[in-house]
Amino acid sequence: MSQEQVVTELLRPIVESMGFIWWGLEYHYNSMNSILRIYVDTQEGGIGIDDIVTITEQLNPILDVEQPITTNYTLEVSSPGLDRILFTLAQCEQFIGATVHCRLRFPFEGKRKFQGIMTAVDHDKETISLTLADGAAEVHLPFTQIDKARIVPQF
C-alpha cells in the first residue's frame, strides 16, 4: 500500500465524519520540505478558512500519533479550487463537458499531455475520453496512466 493510500485510509473517515467531502491528497516528497496537501470540499462547493482551520486542528494530532509519514513535512488543508485535480473516475464523471488538462506517466499515441473537452468516462475500461482542443480527434486515455488530470476553468 502506498503512503498516500495509508494516509487516505487514516484521515478520510475523520474528514467525512466532520461533514466534509474528501477530494484527495498529494504528497510531494522533498529532502528539505515535504508537503502533505489534503483537498476537502463541501456539498455546496467551496470551503472557508474557518473550516480549513478546524480540519487541520483535527488531523494534526492524529498524524502526530500515528506517524504514517516518518520524514518532516508540512500539512496543508486546501479547497480543490476551480482548477481542481481529478483523483478518481467518479470525480471525472462529475465534470463531463468540462475542459480538462491531462499529463500522463508515459506517452500515449506519442504524447504525454492532452487537453480537451471530457466527453465520457468508462468505468469498465477505466478510461476517460477527451475531444481534443482542435476538435479533430477524440482520445481514450487509460486512467491508471494519468499522472494528473486537472480542470481548466473557463472564464
From Swiss-Prot:
Tell me which Gene Ontology terms the entry assigns under biological process.
ribosomal small subunit assembly; translation
Function description: Required for maturation of 30S ribosomal subunits.
Name of this chain's protein: Ribosome maturation factor RimP
Which CDD domains is this protein grouped with?
YlxS_C
Query: Which coarse location class applies to the principal site listed for this UniProt protein?
Result: cytoplasm
Q: Which Gene3D superfamilies is this protein grouped with?
A: Ribosome maturation factor RimP, C-terminal domain, RimP-like superfamily, N-terminal
Give the record's family classification.
Answer: Belongs to the RimP family.
Tell me where in or outside the cell this protein is found: Cytoplasm
